[in-house]
Design a protein with these regions (language model features):
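Bacterial N-terminal signal peptides that target proteins for export
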Residues: 1-9
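Bacterial N-terminal signal peptides
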Residues: 9-17
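Sec/Tat signal peptide C-region and signal peptidase I cleavage site
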Residues: 20-24
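Flexible "cap/lid" subdomain of the alpha/beta-hydrolase fold that forms the substrate-access gate
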Residues: 25-31, 41-43, 53, 81, ...
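Conserved HGGG/HGGXW glycine-rich cap/lid loop of the alpha/beta-hydrolase fold
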Residues: 41, 47-92
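Catalytic histidine-centered segment of alpha/beta-hydrolase-like enzymes
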Residues: 279-288, 292
């Protein structure tokens, strides 16, 4: 079964975002911080609430704090855990491109789940966190209870669009730049935080990026992002075996919405796809209230 939802306009999104920012201003005082060991790599996480485990995985450029509004909205019914991926903020930053292989990133999430005494979790991922989340669901299905993806198409969809869609090829030029040697030298903490709209949050982001390793951030692209010449993945499909909720801000210029087409063919359970006009790549921030309320309703159904 597939449910398609198209909702909200720009004005409503802006109102929701301002309200969410005010409520989340002091979340630092209400989370507990911890570390899990992932084969010698220390993975930092922030957690709040109790109940079924929800693990949230950020993308680029970001850190655990991106989930603050969703954490607040779920913590009365769930234990919500937001991690810093390796290379970011308070997590370890191992040297070497090979240490950012997606299989190791998957292992980091599994280490957090095990560290918290659980065998499975609801997995939430945005951008590169979405890459990790998809790979968990596809290759380690026994640890994924349900899957929530934000602005990251299924890998089959992205593979197809990179191979055949000139607009997606053009809009992925940033990734090709990131794959070049020394690309991190052009990055600054202030520049990476440029997408953050709330001034107080932006200060936190600049501090977090100051603790991060820019080269490590780009190793995600160097190790895992497809390289030219792009080819479509036509290998046998391993279907996702759990229910899936997807959000896609339609203003995303990095990951275009045509990559969503066909997603239902790669999922064996129900898929709920929520497209959000007026929101961009960081839909969890641009449409914070919508994302949180939809996520909560879907999880509690």
């Amino acid at each position: 079964m597939i449910t398609l939802i198209k909702t909200l306009g720009t004005a409503a999104l802006l109102t929701a975002g301002v309200a969410g920012a005010a409520r989340a201003a002091d979340i630092d005082d209400r989370v507990t911080h911890g570390y899990a060991d992932s084969n010698g790599v220390k993975i930092h996480y922030a957690t709040m609430g109790s109940g079924p485990l929800v693990v949230m995985i950020h993308g680029f450029p970001d850190y655990w704090y991106t989930w603050r509004r969703q954490m607040e909205g779920l913590a009365d019914r769930f234990q919500v855990v937001a991690i810093d991926q390796r290379g970011y903020n308070l997590s370890d930053k191992p040297a070497g491109v090979e240490n950012y292989d997606v299989r190791l990133l998957v292992g980091d999430v599994m280490a957090v789940i095990k560290h918290l005494g659980q065998q499975k979790a609801i997995i939430v991922g945005h951008d590169w966190g979405g890459v990790v989340a998809w790979q968990l669901a596809i290759n380690v299905p026994q640890v994924v209870d349900r899957l929530i993806i934000l602005n990251l198409p299924h890998p089959r969809g992205l593979s197809r669009e990179l191979a055949h869609n000139p607009e997606q090829q053009q809009n992925s030029a940033y990734a090709r730049r990131f794959q070049q040697e020394g690309a991190e030298k052009s990055l600054t903490a202030e520049g990476l935080a440029g997408w953050v709209k709330d001034p107080d949050a932006k200060k936190k982001y600049v501090e977090a990026f100051g603790r991060s390793d820019f080269g490590a951030m780009l190793n995600f692209y160097k190790r895992n992002y497809p390289r030219e010449p792009y080819t479509e993945d036509t290998s046998p499909v391993k279907k996702v075996q759990c229910p899936v909720l997807m959000f896609h801000g339609l203003g995303d210029t990095a990951l275009l919405s045509p990559a969503l087409n066909g997603t239902w063919d790669w999922i064996d359970k129900d898929l709920t796809l929520t497209t959000v006009p007026g929101a961009g790549h960081f839909v969890q921030a641009d449409a914070a209230d919508l994302v949180t309320k939809t996520m909560r309703a879907w999880l509690l159904r």
